[in-house]
Amino acid sequence: MKLNFISKSWRRSLKYLLPILFLIPLFAVLLAGRSPWAIAQSPRQEIRGVWLTINDIDVLKDRAKVRDAVSQLARLNFNTIYPVVWNSGYVIYPSAVAQRMGIQPFVYHGRQGQDLLADLIIEAHRQGLLVIPWFEFGFMTPPTSELALNHPNWITQRRDGSQTWNSAAGEVVSLNPFLPEVQQFITDLVLEIVSQYDVDGIQFDDHMSLPRELGYDRYTIDLYVRETKKNPHPDSQNPEWVRWRANKITAFMERLNKAVKANKPHAIFSVAPASYDFAYKAHLQDWRAWVQKNIVDELIVQIYLSDLQSFLEKINRPEIQEAQQKIPTGVGILTGLRNKPIPMQQVQSQVLAARDRGLGVCFFFYESLWDYAPEPIAERQARFQSLFPIPARRFASHGFAIE
């Protein structure tokens, strides 16, 4: 015989009490100043972003232009801005770290004397967009920068002793990502941004890596010998030598993530690398492992291709599909360069292909959205509006959501 220990009146009370009990943790979180939905990002949060590069500095310096730019992005239903904060060995915000290191003899200010990053954050948040500063140059710096000149022992090299290499930004050298002093310097800059500004995260890109032909400096050789009991392979493509260096970069990114989260637990730790095969084999950037190890909260893979079929092959890769199951994932799409305008038809076809596969998008770069374009500004903006006819919800670390 089944015993009924709960009276009918008590069962009626439970009917009303259970929803209240369910809501108690929710209100506790809200009272603590955090949105419960901001604790972990859903993989289904759609990224609609744009990078503000050093080429956009004239926009960033002018308060009215910032307001207009953010208003336009909000009107077109974008939800995330990635402003550059680290480029060519310099930061674009007042930095005690840079001043202490003696690597920056100037400070970027707006035309009205404002802090560029703080001004952008205030305006973007007012209009419902996230701001995730972009640590563009990573370990890369020009050989003529104060950083390279003042710290020559921080620069790594090839087997023949040469150091410089040609990037899209011109001639550069690479800071040694395995050197503790370099790791501490990068960490200090990143934590300065995360702790002093109301940012929604921090982003690193394909330059948080090392060209595979580098790493033959004295410190790295000694470290490799100490750990493996053998010399680095003379062939920079040797799988074991590649794996060891890639693992070291992964370990640093894991520590950097923990440092960021210790300062701002809900900050989005974003990475925007190149396609995986190239990133790992050519630049020792094992971002697939970063995703698997839960180092990354958001992934945007740069796929700057004009041919649609080649673009489709890249976005259909299994490592992208794998990331999609865990975190918000998107594709970096080129909207043009100052000397290379991109027709809107190409942009539209790539956006539609990405979104059809559940991927978000981020455009490189802001002024090429419509200022450096083959089509008139009004037409270009109207076609962006047709791509994003309704807003996309995105949750921020401080609790507001894009409706």
Predicted features and spans:
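Aromatic- and acidic-residue-enriched segments that line the glycan-binding/catalytic groove
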Residues: Y93-P105, F139-N166, D206-H233
